[in-house]
Swiss-Prot record:
GO terms for cellular component: membrane. It comes from Arabidopsis thaliana. It is found in: Membrane. Pfam families: p450 (PF00067). This is Cytochrome P450 78A7.
């Protein structure tokens, strides 16, 4: 009885306190509020129950437009599968869900009010990525706030986006442009090798990540802005730039509940996204505008064929001429995207070589045979074609550790899309491809958990630039990564030099851990620490 009285008092308190919090002291309003709450709960449960496969965002039969229904988990009312995917490693969770339900072709689920499908099978993945009806991307709140909706990655499919793509493909990522900046990549690599040697001699081991990140930053800054940073002489400027890039990574890679439950953004912002974006954007504008202004003054006579990418953008005229805000957005995206994948892919590759010394030895023998020792100079871009085992090692790393396991950024259907399996994906659906699931599927790859570069040697070699969806880490179709060739050239050169110059072994006080953390890309959770022995 005492417990019942206590419960009654608690109930009475909340019946008065809740409406009072909304500005009411009328008990009639209390019952009205209660009825409204119960009605919302009831309708949410009914909607969820009737939605069927895929959950609440697939209500009204959205998953049954074709002759074959799209299967998938219901999740829970209102939230769908948000709680399942908002923590941990989403690519592994989705793969486990698809494999356990035999839904590898395609699986529907709900992220709040957002209908989502994920493909975990190469043929359906190809249909999605190659379809012109999936050429758009859903724009996250952070991407819009950080100006990415006016850059190549997130700009909607149309005249403006095609123009940006053409400019980048012609003036930054074309083979002749990549070759023109070879000397800069060679310089970045030489500085990294020197820094690795200094750290090993001073500390007895090397944490590779910071050296890779600096080299990646200087690589993209050199080709895009025509400048590089000395970590000692320009420490303040370098710290500011790396701080901005790191903050951008965190904001764009963070799971923002308001992207899927828009009403939540009015009163809940757990990561302070709006405030942090508002603080970061002026810093970006100041940095990039300063560089643009410097180019306007000092490079007014420089031709686009011999200048950097800023010179190219400033030289454009007519329909191709960009407004300054658009130019800032495009250049900021180049910095942002260019400093991520190359560094983390190289770190994953070196970690696997530390764990597989036989592979490391075979790779070093190939490099020394084709290129020679230190007396013959550094590895050149022209040498990379003579190193098939090196290319196989990088491809196998991309298979085991795709930097964008869900291809980083999803696609958005602009109309109903009929697939070959009889399913129809409705207009307005967010589409993902789980590349990690495909590259770890034993029906696609033999012994998929084993690091085995031999699977890419000889006649078993394959195109990884979007032609074969068994391994397409850079995507495919209209939204394939435009910088894939530059990125691969950079990573293979770095790995070649690091293996040629040093022997890499485990630090027994901190063994290599291949645990993952999924941010904007999939990184090593614990940075690689190794003991290196200088060869020459």
């Amino acid at each position: 009885m005492e417990l019942m009285n206590l419960a009654s008092k608690e109930t009475s308190y909340w019946m008065i306190a809740l409406p009072a919090g909304f500005g009411s002291q009328n008990l009639h309003d209390v019952s009205t509020l209660g009825y409204l709450f119960l009605a919302v709960v009831f309708l949410s449960i009914v909607t969820w129950a009737l939605a069927g496969g895929g959950g609440v965002a697939w209500k009204n039969g959205r998953n049954r437009l074709g002759r074959v229904a799209i299967p998938g988990p219901r999740g829970i009312p209102v939230f769908g599968s948000l709680f399942t995917l908002s923590r941990g490693l989403a690519h592994r969770t989705l793969a486990a869900m698809a494999w356990s339900r035999a839904n590898t072709e395609i699986m529907a689920f709900s992220l709040g009010s957002t209908p989502v499908i994920v493909a975990s099978e190469p043929n359906i993945a190809r249909e999605i990525l190659m379809s012109p009806h999936f050429a758009d991307r859903p724009v996250k709140q952070s991407a819009k706030s950080l100006m990415f909706s006016r850059a190549i990655g997130f700009a909607p499919n149309g005249t403006y986006w095609r123009m940006l793509r053409r400019i980048a493909s012609t003036h930054l990522f074309a083979p002749r442009r990549i070759l023109a900046h070879e000397a800069g990549r060679q310089l970045d690599c030489a500085e990294m090798v020197k820094a690795v040697s200094v750290e090993q001699n001073g500390a007895g081991s090397v944490v590779l990540r910071k050296h890779l990140q600096l080299a990646a930053l200087n690589n993209i800054m050199g080709s895009v802005f025509g400048r590089r940073y000395d970590p000692l002489a320009q420490k303040e400027d370098l710290d500011e730039l790396t701080s901005m890039v790191r903050e951008g990574f965190e904001l764009l890679g963070a799971f923002n509940w308001s992207d899927y439950l828009p009403w939540l953004g009015y009163f809940y912002d757990s990561i302070r996204l709006n405030q942090r974006c508002s603080d970061l954007v002026p810093r970006i504008r100041t940095l990039v505008k300063k560089i643009i202004d410097e180019h306007r003054v000092s490079n007014s006579e420089k031709k686009r064929d011999i200048g950097d990418f800023v010179d190219v953008l400033l030289s454009l005229d007519g329909d191709e001429k960009l407004q300054e805000d658009d130019m800032i957005a495009v250049l900021w995206e180049m910095i942002f995207r260019g400093t991520d994948t190359t560094a983390l892919l190289t770190e994953w590759t070196m970690a696997e070589l530390v764990l597989n010394p036989n592979v490391q030895t075979k790779l070093r023998d190939e490099i020394l045979t084709a290129v020679g020792d230190g007396a013959d100079g550094d590895v050149a871009d022209a040498d990379l074609a003579k190193l098939p085992y090196l290319n196989a090692v990088v491809k196998e790393t991309l298979r085991l550790h795709p930097p964008g396991p869900l291809l980083s950024w999803a696609r958005l259907s602009t109309s109903d899309v009929q697939l070959s399996n009889g399913m129809v994906i409705p207009k307005g659906t967010t589409a993902m491809v789980n590349m990690w699931a495909i590259t770890h599927d034993q029906t696609v790859w033999s012994d998929p958990l084993k690091f085995d570069p031999e699977r890419f040697t000889g006649n078993a070699d394959m195109d990884i630039r979007g032609g074969d969806l068994r391994l397409a880490p850079f995507g495919a179709g209209r939204r394939v990564c435009p910088g894939k060739n530059m990125g691969l050239a950079t990573v293979t050169r770095w790995v070649a030099e690091l293996v040629r110059r040093f022997e890499w072994g485990q630090d027994q006080t901190e063994p290599v851990d291949l645990g993952e953390v999924l941010k904007l890309s999939c990184e090593m959770e614990h940075p690689l620490r190794a003991v290196v022995t200088e060869i020459f």
